[in-house]
Amino acid sequence: MIKQRTLKQATTVTGIGLHSGQKVKLTLRPAPANTGIIYARTDLTPAVYFTADANLVGDTTLCTCMINDDGVRISTVEHLNAAVSALGLDNLIIEVNAPEVPIMDGSSSPFIYLLLDAGIEEQESPKKFIRIKQTVRIEDGDKWAELKPYNNGLKLDFTIEFNHPMISKDVRHFNMELSAKNFIHNISRARTFTFMKDVEYLQSMGLALGGSLDNAIVLDEYRILNEEGLRYKDELVKHKMLDSIGDLFMCGYNILGEFTAYKSGHGLNNKLLRAVLANKNAWEFVTFDDTQQAPQGYQIGEQVFI
């Protein structure tokens, strides 16, 4: 049987909030089987809790942000979500003492090591997957994203398009099958990126106050401003794929399907996920009593993550 997973113990880290520029304390706690992924604002009294839910995503400007009916927000959840999804965690309490998850270095890598350091353990309940049964496609001008049936895991294919000398055709496309090993080695270190002109505008509006060359790739009109350069030659498209993994995990379950996207972002990813979940004929819950029948990325061998 493919079993649910949680952490062995709680773990805490402090980082900077991308938007506020203030310190944020993040605590990740184990949770009982069938709890799901729960987010908590512990700076509020009483604490405010959110369950992973595509319909709670209320703002996708610069990041994925959940907003409840009272207007309480938790922003920048996507990089942590991607790490949680890649490691196949099902039950987790995510606590922050601010309106946002810390940006760390702009990638998922710090969250991966935080989770692995806490340890991952299986629980005595079957893991539920969402299996895609029908193709669903969302378009916005020339941008599009779709999910279609694929039973052996989550296959991802992403293409970006930017008119910039550092973003040539050979680094605009990437595809991968999601597994812990593939995620850690191929895309977990891919950082968020932005353009200098956008940074200046956002900070003049009181946004992205925590953004810096320490947690983002910044490009001017001609070059990359980070002295150390890129971590992968195709780091930009890999980060967009990382974002998509996090955005698709807003349903709280690992998806079995094939995701293909062209110039997609947080907003379009969320619209796609909502459209899939709203169509009861397009998906179903599945479990695997026979481990050998499960997607390879979730079989026992994948316990060796690094």
From Swiss-Prot:
Chain residues that bind Zn(2+): 79, 239, 243
Pfam families documented for this protein: LpxC
Secretion signal, residue range per the UniProt entry: none
Keyword entries, A-Z: Hydrolase, Lipid A biosynthesis, Lipid biosynthesis, Lipid metabolism, Metal-binding, Zinc
InterPro entries, sorted: Ribosomal_Su5_D2-typ_SF, UDP-acyl_GlcNac_deAcase, UDP-acyl_GlcNac_deAcase_C, UDP-acyl_N-AcGlcN_deAcase_N
GO MF: metal ion binding; UDP-3-O-acyl-N-acetylglucosamine deacetylase activity
Protein name: UDP-3-O-acyl-N-acetylglucosamine deacetylase
Family the entry assigns: Belongs to the LpxC family.
Active site (catalytic residues): 266
Positions in coiled-coil regions: none
Lineage: Bacteria, Pseudomonadati, Pseudomonadota, Gammaproteobacteria, Pasteurellales
Keyword Lyase recorded: no
Listed pathway(s): Glycolipid biosynthesis; lipid IV(A) biosynthesis; lipid IV(A) from (3R)-3-hydroxytetradecanoyl-[acyl-carrier-protein] and UDP-N-acetyl-alpha-D-glucosamine: step 2/6
Domain of life from the UniProt record: Bacteria
Function: Catalyzes the hydrolysis of UDP-3-O-myristoyl-N-acetylglucosamine to form UDP-3-O-myristoylglucosamine and acetate, the committed step in lipid A biosynthesis.
Cofactor(s) listed in the protein's UniProt record: Zn(2+)
Record-level GO BP terms: lipid A biosynthetic process
Reactions listed under catalytic activity: a UDP-3-O-[(3R)-3-hydroxyacyl]-N-acetyl-alpha-D-glucosamine + H2O = a UDP-3-O-[(3R)-3-hydroxyacyl]-alpha-D-glucosamine + acetate
Gene transcribed to yield this protein: lpxC
